[in-house]
Structure formats: C-alpha cells, structure tokens
Amino acid sequence: MTPTIEIVETPTDEVVTALARLLPQLSSATPPTASELEAIIAGGGTFFVARIDGQIVGCLTLILYRIPTGLKAWIEDVVVDEAARGNGVGEALNLAAIDEARRLGANAVNLTSRRERVAANRLYQRIGFSARDSTVYRKYV
C-alpha cells in the first residue's frame, strides 16, 4: 500500500472529517473547522493529506516565514492514523513537505517531536533531520 500525497487547496467536508478523526491521535486540541482550515491555507500554510486506497490516513502542515536569516519552514501537526502506521505514510508526508519547502526557497526545515514518539523520531533522523542543541519555550497568551 503506497500512500499518495496531496496538497489541499480548498478543504472539503471529507478533509475536515478526516482531520477531526486524526488530530485527537496527536493532541487534545480541538480540530479546526472548514473555515479555520481555509484561514490556515490562506495565511500561507500548506496542508498535506496522505491517502491509502482513497482514504485519508495522515496529514501535516507546512508553514514558511521569512526572517533576516532567510526563509524558514516548519513542519507541524504530523499525524498518521494508528491503523495506517508502518506503511510509509509519515515518510511520504514529510518528504513531500520538504520538497515543497525547497521548491519555495526555504533554507531549512524544522520540526519538533516529543521524546516518547520513538518511531517518529527514528523516521525524522532516517530522512535527514538532526536534533538541535536547543530548547523550545512556550508561553500561553
């Protein structure tokens, strides 16, 4: 089962429903509505979905931003349905996002992953990411 990757330009009910099923496997955040997903895309985010046999089984968001040191890219909210893991979905999604970031001129792609996501961290290292000696801080506002 080889996954196919698509960039979502206009969120359909199918995409919103799939995200409502997938996102709880990653986070306790409330899944976005169609209009919120449209705002992410309109704001410069690129939303990818992965399909196996026509069904959406994974997604990620690629965000690009320009700062004085260049165009940077972040991969966020990578999630693969538990039932589809081990089929190359995460790898295909990440490689598609990296290709898109490169095509758009980014000079680096960053992502974060919790330590306990052992398989995900192994994947990121296998496809060329390296851990940075950095600490990520967060402040809720």
Language model: regions and residue ranges:
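Conserved N-terminal entry element of GNAT/NAT acetyltransferase domains
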Residues: 1-13
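Active-site rim helix/loop that mediates acceptor-substrate recognition in acyltransferases
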Residues: 27-47
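Active-site beta-strand termini and strand-to-loop segments that position acidic
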Residues: 51-53, 139-140
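Conserved acetyl-CoA-binding loop-helix of GNAT-fold acetyltransferases
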Residues: 80, 86-99, 122, 126
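Conserved active-site alpha-helix within GNAT-family acetyltransferase domains
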Residues: 91, 115-133, 139
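Conserved GNAT acetyl-CoA-binding A-motif
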Residues: 101-113
